[in-house]
Amino acid sequence: MHAEAVAGIVDRVVTRYRRDPTCMLQILREVQEACDWIPPEAVDRMQATLGVPRTKIEGVAGFYSFLYTQPRGKYRILFSDNITDRMAGNLALMERLCSNLWIEPGKVSEDGLVSVDKTSCTGMCDQGPALLVNNYAVTRLSAERIDEIAELVRNKVPVAEWPADYFKVEDNIRKPDIMLASQMSPGDALRAARERVPSDGLMASNMRSWREGLPSGLGGPAAMLDEIKRANLRGRGGAGFTTGLKWEACRNAPLKPGQQRFVVCNADEGEPGTFKDRVLLTSYADLVFEGMTVAAYAIGARRGFLYLRGEYRHLLEPLNAVLERRRQDKLLGTDIIGIPGGDFDIEIHLGAGAYVCGEESALIESLEGKRGTPRNRPPFPVTNGYLDQPTIVNNVETFAAAALIALKGGEWYAAIGTKLSAGTKILSVSGDCERPGLYEYPFGVSIQQVLDDCGAKDTQAVQVSGPSGVCVSPDEFDRVIGFEDIPTAGAFTIFDNSRDMFEVARNYVHFFQHESCGFCTPCRVGTSLLKNLMDKLHNGCGSPYDFTEIEKLNQLLQSMSHCGLGHTACNPVLDTIAKFRPAYEKHMVQQDFAPAFDLDRALASARQMTGRDDAAAHIIKEEFGEENSL
C-alpha cells in the first residue's frame, strides 16, 4: 500500500476519534484492520496528526499481541491454545493447516497471503478447538473444516464470504437461575430505581441533576446505593470487593473543576477457561448496559465505557446496535427515562490481546491509549481512575446483578446464596464432561454438584477460577463455590484421569510467561525461569532440586511482583505438586541435581556437519559410584 493511501486511512480514523491521543489503541486497531498491519508510514502520520512522539506510538503498538508492526498475512490465523484446546487436539489441527498451506507456524507465507500462530484462550472453551481468523472466531474445528479453510485461503476467498456456520458461537446455557433466566425488559430496572425515590426526594430530584445528588436523607442515588449495599453484592471478577462500598467511595470522591465520574465495565475476560461474559454480552447486553446505567445513577456519572477483549471482536457491531437502540428508547443519552439531568452514555473500546488488562488499573491505562501496565495503588480508581478522575470498574456479571437488584431490591438478592456470598454465580464449565457450557447456581453449591450436573465422569481434578485459581482434587469435591471457601471469576475446567496434570500446569505456566507485561523484573524474569524449569521437567531432566527452585521463585514472585499476575504465577505448579506429585516424578531423574539440557545431544548438529561420530566428538558422562557421588 502506497504511503499516500496509508496517510489517507490514518487521517480518516484519527478524525473519527477527534484527534484524541487517549484513543490511541482504537486508532491503531482500526488502521491495522485497513492495512493488515501497522506500517511505518502509519506511525509517521499518527505522530504528525496526534502530536504524540513516535516512541510512544511504537511502545503502545508493541505491547499488544494483536497489533503488528511487521507484515502479517492477509489471512491472520491464530489457534486458541488454552488447555482445553490442547485436549481437543488443536496442535495437530494447526500442523495440518500449516502443511496444507506450506507454511511454518509463527511465520508469514512467502507470498504474504497467510500467517498461522497460536494465541491464548479465546473464550470458546465449550466449543473448541477454536481459532481466530482476522479477529473473528471459528469454532468446533475438525480435520475436515481445516481442509476447507485451507482451500478458502488458497482461493483467496474473503473472510466475509466464508460459510456462516464456521462463525457460529453458541451460548450453551445449561442451567439458568435468576440472571440467565431473567426476562427483564429494557428500562425496567431504571424505572424501578426511580420509583423507589420518596415523594420528597422526587421533588428534590426534579430540581437537580443526578450528578449533583440529593440532600442527606432523601432518596434517588442514595437510595440506589443503599439497595446495592443491602444486597451484599460483591464483585464477580474474582477479587470480591463489596460493590456498594466501591460505588459509595466513588460517589463521595471530591471533584476538581472540570472533572466528572466514570463507569467502566471490564469485559476483558482473559482468564483461561472463562466465557460467561461472552454469553452475557451476546444474549443479555441490555441487562449489562442497564446495570451500568444504574451505577451511573448511583454515583453521578455521565460517561461509561465497555472495555471489550479483542478476542470478542465479533460482538462489537451487535453491541453497538444495542447501544443505539437504547439511545433511541431514551435509555441512554440525555434525560434518561425522564430523570432531569439524567445524562449518561456508553462507548465501547476494544482491547488487543493483553491478559494483564483484566486488572482494573491496567485496563484504565489501556482506555487512556497507553500500554496496559498496572498502576501503583493507592491511589485507587474510585478517586483517581480514568484521566485521574473518580472511576468505578466492575465486571460484566456484577453490572448485570446490579440491574436485577435495582429491579427487585437488595433484600430479595441478599436472601439468595450464603451469608457471606449473596446471589448467584455463573460458572464456565469446560473440559472432560458431557455438557460443557454455562451453569448458574446460588453461592454455596458444591464442586461435586456441578460435576454431577454437567456429566463429568472419572474426574481427577477441577481447576476453579483458571490458572490463577485453585486446583481441586477428588477428596475436596465437597468444597463449595463462595467467598468463604473457593471464590472464582467463573472458570471451572474439568480433567479426567486420562490427563497429565503436570502438562496442565505446564500449559498454564507458559500462559503466564507469555502474558507477563514485562513492567517489573521479578515477574518478567521469574515467569521465564518458571517456564524453563517446567520445560526441563518435560524433557526428562528434572530433579528434587527443581522443586526447591520453584518454591524460591514463588516466594520472590509473591513478595516482589507489581501485580496479581506474578503473585499467582506459581499457583498451578504448587497445587499440582502438592496433590498430583507422581505426575512430576515420572519426569525426574534419580539424583539431587540434573542439568537443564543434554550437552552431548546439543553437539549432534555439529557431528552431522563435520561427519564425525568418534568418541572425541561426544561428551562422556561419568558414572559415579555411591562412594564418589556428589
Q: Where are the language model's segments positioned?
A:
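Feature of Fe-S/electron-transfer and energy-metabolism proteins
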Residues: 1-630
